[in-house]
């Protein structure tokens, strides 16, 4: 209560757990709960790790063409594109059979990486037809990891918890808190879509087209 005797309304925690479907046991965790998941990872930090069949997460080792050839990398998604980051680009790999996609992202909690979630996920999915694909940034822990987590959520029907638990078994990652909040928002959006599809089956006896 304020000094004037007016009740003070407590602000809601925008990052508490959110349950979209009351018939589903799953609830999207709050941001702090998501951070705690990374403490359970056992993988040691190395330059490059295969975190999903055909998908590698790495650091600035992406400049090392010999390593790329040894790993038989055919596609590169650079989430630290640009002259102030890991400035490679398609021309850097012109002597190699590599498809390149660059995103000029910054490892800042205020940077909106979510606008690239779907375009990056589509590039990853297309790259796996070859494969192999490297997603990298400067350290291979935040930007690149966030995009791989988003891919697993969008195309492999994983929750954000499932995706994190899958990747931390194989690589030491830690997206910044802003990116975690963006993944959390994606998780809620995808949960709503799944709930809508389930309701479509229940109500009409047939599955509606996915949104």
Curated annotation (Swiss-Prot):
GO terms for biological process: negative regulation of MAPK cascade; protein dephosphorylation. Residues 47-192 form the Tyrosine-protein phosphatase domain. CDD domains: DUPD1. The keyword Cytoplasm applies. Its EC number is 3.1.3.16, 3.1.3.48. It is found in: Cytoplasm; Nucleus. One of its GO terms (molecular function) is protein tyrosine phosphatase activity. The active site is at residue 137. Substrate binds at residues 136-143. InterPro entries: Atypical_DUSP_subfamA (IPR020405), Dual-sp_phosphatase_cat-dom (IPR000340), Prot-tyrosine_phosphatase-like (IPR029021), Tyr_Pase_AS (IPR016130), Tyr_Pase_dom (IPR000387), TYR_PHOSPHATASE_DUAL_dom (IPR020422). One of its GO terms (cellular component) is cytoplasm. Dual specificity phosphatase able to dephosphorylate phosphotyrosine, phosphoserine and phosphothreonine residues within the same substrate, with a preference for phosphotyrosine as a substrate. Involved in the modulation of AMPK and MAPK1/2 signaling pathways. Belongs to the protein-tyrosine phosphatase family. Non-receptor class dual specificity subfamily. This is Dual specificity phosphatase 29.
